[in-house]
Every structure is written in C-alpha cells, then in structure tokens.
Amino acid sequence: MEEDQELERKISGLKTSMAEGERKTALEMVQAAGTDRHCVTFVLHEEDHTLGNSLRYMIMKNPEVEFCGYTTTHPSESKINLRIQTRGTLPAVEPFQRGLNELMNVCQHVLDKFEASIKDYKDQKASRNESTF
C-alpha cells in the first residue's frame, strides 16, 4: 500500500491541468489488476509520434528496461499508450521519469546550440556589413 502511494506521489508531479478551467489529466498510469509495478502502461493525452518515439528511444537506453514501446490509439485521437517493462526491482515509473528528464536535456542542448548558431550568423552578417562600408 505504501509503495502504491509513493508511486502515485511520483507521477502526481507529471500531471497537468488543461485549458478552459476544466481539470484534465495529461498523464494516466494504467496497470492491470494483479500485475506488479514493473510492467506499466502510461497514457499520454494530447501527444503523438513526436514525443512517443523520442521518449521510447531515451527509455530504451536504460539497461534496466526490458521492453518499451508505444502505440497511437487512433489517427483522430491525440494520445499515445507507452508501455514499459523493467528487469529486477526497478518500478516502471523510474525509467519513465528519467527518460523524460533526459529528453528535456537533449532538447535544451539542441535549443542552446541553435540559438548560439543564430547569434554567430547574425554577428558574422553584421561584421560583413561593417567591412563593406
């Protein structure tokens, strides 16, 4: 029972509210009755292949993860089902959180490099304009 409360506490930080004042969960954790915490399906609402495949890749880099895959429920629905199965004693929510954090770090790195390249380009363009006068 304490493990379930701890697991719920960990994923509660990942839940968000949607617009229009209506509270809607962006993330659900689905576990079949009688299964353990090592094999869990996460339902991510308002997401598609962009997040699904990137997150699956990041999670599969973890050696403790035995399986990670995702499906889109239907082309007209914007939600994905992400299934994670771990080896040993690691609960599935751990590599899920780690994968999200690592993916955010990669995205931040790409953004930083992109902004630095834009700045370099603008600086080079400005120096060329100054040298022509």
UniProtKB/Swiss-Prot annotation:
Domain of life: Eukaryota
Protein name according to UniProt: DNA-directed RNA polymerases I and III subunit RPAC2
Residues that span the membrane, as ranges: none
An individual GO BP term: transcription by RNA polymerase III
A Pfam family: RNA_pol_L_2
Summary of the function given for this chain in its UniProt record: DNA-dependent RNA polymerase catalyzes the transcription of DNA into RNA using the four ribonucleoside triphosphates as substrates. Common component of RNA polymerases I and III which synthesize ribosomal RNA precursors and short non-coding RNAs including 5S rRNA, snRNAs, tRNAs and miRNAs, respectively.
GO (cellular component) term, any one: RNA polymerase I complex
Matching Gene3D superfamilies: RNA polymerase, RBP11-like subunit
Entry's disease: Treacher Collins syndrome 2: A form of Treacher Collins syndrome, a disorder of craniofacial development. Treacher Collins syndrome is characterized by a combination of bilateral downward slanting of the palpebral fissures, colobomas of the lower eyelids with a paucity of eyelashes medial to the defect, hypoplasia of the facial bones, cleft palate, malformation of the external ears, atresia of the external auditory canals, and bilateral conductive hearing loss.
Family: Belongs to the archaeal Rpo11/eukaryotic RPB11/RPC19 RNA polymerase subunit family.
Keywords: Acetylation, Disease variant, DNA-directed RNA polymerase, Nucleus, Transcription
Localization (cell): Nucleus; Nucleus, Nucleolus
Oligomeric form and interacting partners: Component of the RNA polymerase I and RNA polymerase III complexes consisting of at least 13 and 17 subunits, respectively. Pol I complex consists of a ten-subunit catalytic core composed of POLR1A/RPA1, POLR1B/RPA2, POLR1C/RPAC1, POLR1D/RPAC2, POLR1H/RPA12, POLR2E/RPABC1, POLR2F/RPABC2, POLR2H/RPABC3, POLR2K/RPABC4 and POLR2L/RPABC5; a mobile stalk subunit POLR1F/RPA43 protruding from the core and additional subunits homologous to general transcription factors POLR1E/RPA49 and POLR1G/RPA34.
MF (Gene Ontology): DNA binding; DNA-directed RNA polymerase activity; protein dimerization activity
Modified residues (N-acetylmethionine): 1
